[in-house]
């Protein structure tokens, strides 16, 4: 917590991450409740639960894209505004009955969750550049704690907002849009200070499959040094826990 007071850039990034993660979490459980209001609730809820899981499948791909992004601060800000626009569209769609509108909401929800992961990946190099090496572990740990707290409190806040608004899904989506808007606006104020090391493009571009295989082998060799058996099962368990979290 002392790091927040000592490092203004870290405090700013933490505030932005808090607003973005809270915004992403608020609608996740509300989305399932919205699905339950569909004409065929059992089918819709099943689809909604699957939709919430899907962004986790793109985590590696999104992370690699974030690493390769050159102007990270610019995209960090732009994406927050884009998410605000997406949730304004979601707010409008929730007023339209039927599965067509529900399908559009599902798609926009997937896109927004993937963008939140992308923003998280963009923040890491900025943190590494602006935070002393001896404080990096504390900063990363605080980020993980912040994400967990936002995930739990955000869903609770979403249900509470839904209850006091008498299931006004459009209102909750609009509040989500505001959180994303604020998340980017607070970064825009100090955009020039959000620096990072230059991104070096690889000499030869490998396919996504090749890079995933290389990443898998590197991770496997690391765990092999620690004498961890059944690495494949362990990796699957970690991905599943991350998705459920």
Model-derived regions, located:
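MFS-fold secondary transporters
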Residues: 36, 89-93, 112, 186-187
């Amino acid at each position: 917590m002392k790091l927040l007071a000592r490092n203004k850039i870290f405090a700013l990034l933490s505030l932005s991450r808090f607003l973005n993660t809270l915004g992403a979490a608020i609608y996740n459980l509300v989305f399932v409740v919205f699905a339950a209001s569909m004409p065929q609730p059992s089918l819709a809820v099943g689809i909604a639960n699957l939709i919430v899981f899907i962004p986790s499948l793109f985590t590696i791909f999104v992370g690699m894209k974030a690493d390769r992004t050159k102007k990270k601060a610019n995209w960090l800000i732009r994406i927050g505004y884009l998410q605000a626009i997406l949730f304004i569209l979601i707010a409008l769609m929730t007023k339209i009955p039927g599965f067509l509108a529900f399908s559009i909401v599902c798609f926009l929800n997937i896109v927004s969750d993937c963008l939140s992961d992308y923003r998280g990946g963009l923040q890491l190099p900025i943190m590494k550049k602006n935070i002393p090496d001896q404080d990096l572990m504390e900063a990363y740990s605080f980020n993980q704690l912040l994400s967990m707290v936002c995930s739990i409190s955000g869903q609770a806040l979403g249900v509470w907002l839904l209850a006091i608004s008498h299931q006004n899904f459009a209102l909750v989506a609009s509040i989500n849009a505001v959180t994303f808007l604020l998340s980017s606006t607070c970064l825009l104020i100090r955009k020039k200070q959000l620096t990072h090391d230059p991104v070096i493009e690889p000499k030869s571009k490998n396919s996504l499959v090749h890079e995933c295989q290389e990443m898998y082998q590197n991770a496997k060799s690391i765990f092999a040094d620690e004498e961890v058996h059944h690495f494949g099962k362990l990796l699957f368990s970690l991905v599943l826990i991350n998705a459920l979290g």
